[in-house]
Amino acid sequence: KLSDIAVPERALYLRTIMAELQRVASHLMATGAFINDCGAWQTPVMHCFRDREKVLDLFEMTCGARITTNYMRIGGVAFDIPDEFLPVLDKLVNGDLPFRFDELEDLIVGNEIILMRARDVGVVSPEVAINASLSGPMLRSTGVAWDIRKADPYAVYDRVAFDIPVGYN
């Protein structure tokens, strides 16, 4: 916006896809780290890291890097996606991940170690969350339905229909 450079439509969609994939990878890493910190390591942690690897494989397929992708550039993206990207992405988001998330939820929600160490710990009210400038999953976990992708959409988020995930701690 500052330099008045128009980003091609395809690049806007690719940016959105990559941002969402990074969000998934980040949430999987954070969830795995949380489980590990609670002492409930092994199965749930390995599930998180295994699924994160599948997302990182897509990054590597696209630009050769798994973590520091350096993909988004002024005016667009560094590379177009390879031909095999969309079939792998489709299998991941429409097959593997939904099943894995259900499986992971079952492993976490009923896990006695996690329940003993996390229940009623660090409960934050919506008012405190807002006053402390919490954002993202931390803010939404207090019941506040605010998401930057809806409040101030970038890329093509204004054209993507999604619900804001909200929890209540």
Describe the residue ranges of each PLM region.
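Active-site bordering "gate/hinge" segments
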Residues: 1-169
